[in-house]
Amino acid sequence: MNNRVHQGHLARKRFGQNFLNDQFVIDSIVSAINPQKGQAMVEIGPGLAALTEPVGERLDQLTVIELDRDLAARLQTHPFLGPKLTIYQQDAMTFNFGELAEKMGQPLRVFGNLPYNISTPLMFHLFSYTDAIADMHFMLQKEVVNRLVAGPNSKAYGRLSVMAQYYCNVIPVLEVPPSAFTPPPKVDSAVVRLVPHATMPHPVKDIRVLSRITTEAFNQRRKTIRNSLGNLFSVEVLTGMGIDPAMRAENISVAQYCQMANYLAENAPLQES
C-alpha cells in the first residue's frame, strides 16, 4: 500500500504534506491550544482535519486557510464541520492576517501543523502581523523549534531566534515522533507556542534595520562582528555600546541586537525604497 495515501488523499510532496494521525498527540495539542467559543480561531493547513475536527467541536465558527484545492473541497462538504467553517483556499504566505483580525473584530488565535518546507518564511510573514495576533501554536520540525527558542552562545541561535524573540514569547510545548504522521517525515517534530509581546521588551525604531543587522551578522556567523558588521559599526561605536567587537553573531543577545539597530536607525537611517 502507498504510505503517502491517508483517508483516500495522496499526500503531495510539493505541499510538504504529512498528516497527523496519533490521537494522543492530537489531544495534547488541542489541550495546549485550549480553544474557546467566541475566539477568532484560524487554522493554517488543516489538511485532513486531524486538528480541525477536535478544535471545531469546541467552537461555533472556525476559519481555515488551505492551499490544496482538493482538501479545501473536502472540508467544504465535511458532515459536521462544514457549516462552521470559513475556508480561504489560498497560500498562507500571501494571506493578510491584519485584514482578517479587523473583519473578526479581535486578535487572531492562529494554529496549524505547518508544511515544513515553508515553515521559516511563514514565521517571518506572521511576525509582520503580531499586532493582529493573540497567540500561535504550531507543529514544526523540531530543529526549527530549537532555533526559535535558542538563546545566545548556542549553535541553534540565529536570525530566526532573534526575530522570533523580538516579537514573541516563545514556549516549547511537546515533542512529536515521526510515527505520529502519515507518511512519517524523516525528522522529529515539536509543537511551539508563540505569544506576541503586549509591550515590546526591546522596541526598535526601524524593524528593517534589525532585519538587516541580523542578516549580515548571521550570514557570516563564524566572523567576529568587528568584521561581519564592520561596514555598519566602528570598533569605537560597538565598545561604546558595551558590545565586544571580538564577539560572533551567536554571542550577541536580542537586547544587544536591538540596541545596535536603534543606534543605526538614529545615526544612519535607511532610505525609503
Swiss-Prot record:
SMART domains: rADc (SM00650). SUPFAM superfamilies: S-adenosyl-L-methionine-dependent methyltransferases. InterPro entries: KsgA/Erm, rRNA_Ade_diMease-like_C, rRNA_Ade_Mease_Trfase_CS, rRNA_Ade_methylase_Trfase_N, rRNA_adenine_dimethylase, SAM-dependent_MTases_sf. Gene3D superfamilies: Ribosomal RNA adenine dimethylase-like, domain 2, Vaccinia Virus protein VP39. GO terms for cellular component: cytosol. Specifically dimethylates two adjacent adenosines (A1518 and A1519) in the loop of a conserved hairpin near the 3'-end of 16S rRNA in the 30S particle. May play a critical role in biogenesis of 30S subunits. This is Ribosomal RNA small subunit methyltransferase A.
